[in-house]
Amino acid sequence: MDLHSLLELGTKPTAPHVRNKKVILFDTNHQVSICNQIIDAINSGIDLGDLLEGGLLTLCVEHYYNSDKDKFNTSPIAKYLRDAGYEFDVIKNADATRFLDVIPNEPHYSPLILALKTLESTESQRGRIGLFLSFCSLFLPKLVVGDRASIEKALRQVTVHQEQGIVTYPNHWLTTGHMKVIFGILRSSFILKFVLIHQGVNLVTGHDAYDSIISNSVGQTRFSGLLIVKTVLEFILQKTDSGVTLHPLVRTSKVKNEVASFKQALSNLARHGEYAPFARVLNLSGINNLEHGLYPQLSAIALGVATAHGSTLAGVNVGEQYQQLREAAHDAEVKLQRRHEHQEIQAIAEDDEERKILEQFHLQKTEITHSQTLAVLSQKREKLARLAAEIENNIVEDQGFKQSQNRVSQSFLNDPTPVEVTVQARPINRPTALPPPVDSKIEHESTEDSSSSSSFVDLNDPFALLNEDEDTLDDSVMIPSTTSREFQGIPEPPRQSQDIDNSQGKQEDESTNLIKKPFLRYQELPPVQEDDESEYTTDSQESIDQPGSDNEQGVDLPPPPLYAQEKRQDPIQHPAVSSQDPFGSIGDVNGDILEPIRSPSSPSAPQEDTRAREAYELSPDFTNYEDNQQNWPQRVVTKKGRTFLYPNDLLQTNPPESLITALVEEYQNPVSAKELQADWPDMSFDERRHVAMNL
């Protein structure tokens, strides 16, 4: 015995076995009415159970053989199904006019009988059977991909057929619920798939509009789920006049071994004959030996070569470790193409001028094909990224925040940092609502959540170059985007002119809504800033100091809730001692160079409203977050007259634009914004809060 044959043991059946299955066929003198009632039962979502396969086969026999049982029994369809283990049991009831009358009177059919008694059927047209079968065939091309892709493909085909005037389907058939039912039936019914495929391939005469739709759908189903077979046979095992030659890129020894194994798997697949291109849809034997993962290098090279030839079907992702191999194969194939074209042009061109024209044309043709391929692939990836973002958002909203919500209170009560400056506000009886946490632990978890929302898009893929990052990020609210989205300033809340009870109810509703949607990333409540200020980010990147977060992007925490403005008292300012220079090595800033420019466009210069300009300073009670009656965010005036929005301005990892303007224009040795950016310190939340009161 050859010892190496051990590797192949168990891959081929030595005692083939076929499981026997019984299929019930219905035979009456009113076959069209029975078939229409079967269609109505399926459309109504009634589960026919083990009668489903028989009911579908009854429809096929009526449509293709006009219910002639003798013709059907001698047909290739019946022979194949018998070889596959199906046994036909015919129930005859000549006088039956209802589907109810032909159902066996057995206990396990009683729920089905009760459901059918409530079903009213008024249709008795024979053409409706072909209409239903053609509608089912629309789901075949993308059946192995999934329900969403299959339904989208079916709807596109319906639109095409309606525009061409071929056939029009009832509107209630085109609802998502009904189409999911049909998809589930087609996914589970081998008989229906097999009969549609067999007749779509072999029906050569007697076509009506429904049969042409079925043939068209079956043609699109060829090699569905067998992309590796199609690409390898077309581009790797190249057929020439002298025989089959290997592509130059797969002539190395290791890839040759994969090619040999792949040829063996193909020979096993070819035993299925005319049904081999539909092996994945029909789930035929040997299909599991044709997975991409079994031939990683061959698959990567084949996909790279196919993409170089303009195949958009090859836009699938290979394993991450073989992504670079795919890119290398793509580049090499493009160069080989140019070389072959150059050689051909040299052979067929009669003079230099013709050679130049042909070379220019082929160069343009290659570039156009390549750009079109990249455009289609980028569209596919954008669609995939949007789908991934939607799924990620749903998961995070349903699960992620529930886990971190329990830690909100505790994380805030643990901050013992002393604050020297005080704020006095009139106490109002209102429900206590703690500000949102600035907790590095929670922020790090949410960072990981957001980074996985784009996991479907391979960052190393050269074909994602045309992806519009801004578009992808806009569709996913979980991914921070400061370049493509301009924040609009929040309108100033209405002054308190109603009873305390009314304002209390509004504040409860507002804070509740904010807690419900914590991950909407400033969509509903952006920070207060002007349009011309949108280039600096509001991300809080405290996770930079944490291990393992070097490659992750900082995630915004939800902003503090905005309450209705209160009646304010005159501020009482206390001198504060500066303990830290927030501007690093910029120099001495003792002079009051931070005088705000009083213009409507400056974020630090609010409109001429005395209430809006009244300064607030934090009280010692705020250390333990007991004074929760403050407005969030607050305008804070420092001892140098600088107005900041606390905590928003000081939580930024980049200096605010108003501060940049003041330093660049008024400092005696002007510094550039780039230098200021470099000197802007990396501080924790506690340090920023401390600096905010001591500028």
From Swiss-Prot:
Keyword RNA-binding on entry: yes
Alphabetical list of Pfam families matching this protein: Ebola_NP (PF05505)
The SS bond pairs are none
Q: Which GO terms describe its molecular function?
A: RNA binding
This entry carries the following GO cellular component terms, namely: helical viral capsid; host cell cytoplasm; ribonucleoprotein complex; viral nucleocapsid
Comp. bias (Polar residues):
495-505, 537-552
Provide the function of this protein.
Answer: Encapsidates the genome, protecting it from nucleases. The encapsidated genomic RNA is termed the nucleocapsid and serves as template for transcription and replication. During replication, encapsidation by NP is coupled to RNA synthesis and all replicative products are resistant to nucleases.
Localization: Virion; Host cytoplasm
Origin organism is: Lake Victoria marburgvirus (strain Angola/2005) (MARV)
State the coiled-coil residue ranges. Answer: 316-341, 372-399
After translation, the protein is modified as follows:
Phosphorylated.
Tell me the subunit arrangement. Homooligomer. Homomultimerizes to form the nucleocapsid. Binds to viral genomic RNA. Interacts with VP35 and VP30 to form the nucleocapsid. Also interacts with VP24 and VP40.
A single GO BP term for this record reads:
viral RNA genome packaging
Residue ranges, annotated region (Disordered): 423-458, 483-612
Q: Where is this motif: PTAP/PSAP motif?
A: 603-606
Q: Which family does it belong to?
A: Belongs to the filoviruses nucleoprotein family.
Q: What is this protein called?
A: Nucleoprotein
UniProt remark on domains: This protein can be divided into a hydrophobic N-terminal half, and a hydrophilic and highly acidic C-terminal half.
Q: What is its main location?
A: virion
The cross-references to InterPro entries, in alphabetical order and at most eight, read:
Ebola_NP
UniProt keywords, alphabetically: Capsid protein, Coiled coil, Helical capsid protein, Host cytoplasm, Host-virus interaction, Phosphoprotein, Ribonucleoprotein, RNA-binding, Viral budding, Viral budding via the host ESCRT complexes, Viral nucleoprotein, Viral release from host cell, Virion
